[in-house]
Design a protein with these regions (language model features):
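Acetyl-CoA-dependent GNAT
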Residues: 1-40, 45, 58-59
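Accessory recognition modules or surfaces
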Residues: 26, 51-58, 104-111
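Conserved hydrophobic/aromatic "anchor" residues
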Residues: 26, 48, 84-85, 90
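Short coil/turn motifs at secondary-structure junctions
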Residues: 32-34, 47, 80-82, 111
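Conserved acetyl-CoA-binding loop-helix of GNAT-fold acetyltransferases
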Residues: 44, 50-63, 87
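Short glycine/proline-centered loop/turn elements that form peptide/ligand docking sites
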Residues: 54, 58, 79-83, 97-104
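Conserved GNAT acetyl-CoA-binding A-motif
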Residues: 65-78
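Conserved catalytic-core motifs of GNAT/GCN5-like acyltransferases
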Residues: 74-76, 91-108
Length: 112
């Protein structure tokens, strides 16, 4: 069972995907002071992976970030997740090493 981030829920920043009345996945969009937004997720229940839920959550997150007037949406992707983000229109900007291992900082431009 997924644990949804209570502070982000209270701030209205969480998008939840329901499947048969249960939370099957979620994504968080956090606006930044520099006019960009950070994408946290998507997180999808493992038994529902590869069913399009992650893509739907990212599409909703893009629309939400645009409604917040963010010019760019940023995501941190593990090597395994990087192809998924590329399919969602993100491009790698740089590689960094975190306590969880290497990640690609990826960007999707929202406003021309």
């Amino acid at each position: 069972m997924m644990m949804l981030p209570a502070d982000h829920i209270a701030a209205g920043l969480v998008i939840v995907f329901e499947h048969w009345g249960e939370a099957a996945g979620f994504v968080v969009v956090v606006p930044r002071e520099d006019g960009k937004a950070d994408l946290d997720g998507p997180f999808v229940e493992p038994d529902l992976w590869r069913g399009g839920i992650g893509r739907k959550l990212v599409d909703e997150a893009v629309q939400f970030a645009m409604a917040l007037e963010a010019a760019e949406l940023l995501a941190s992707a593990s090597p395994r997740a990087e192809p998924f983000y590329e399919k969602c229109g993100f491009v790698p900007m740089k590689k960094i090493v975190t306590t969880h291992g290497p990640v690609a900082v990826m960007s999707r431009t929202l406003i021309d």
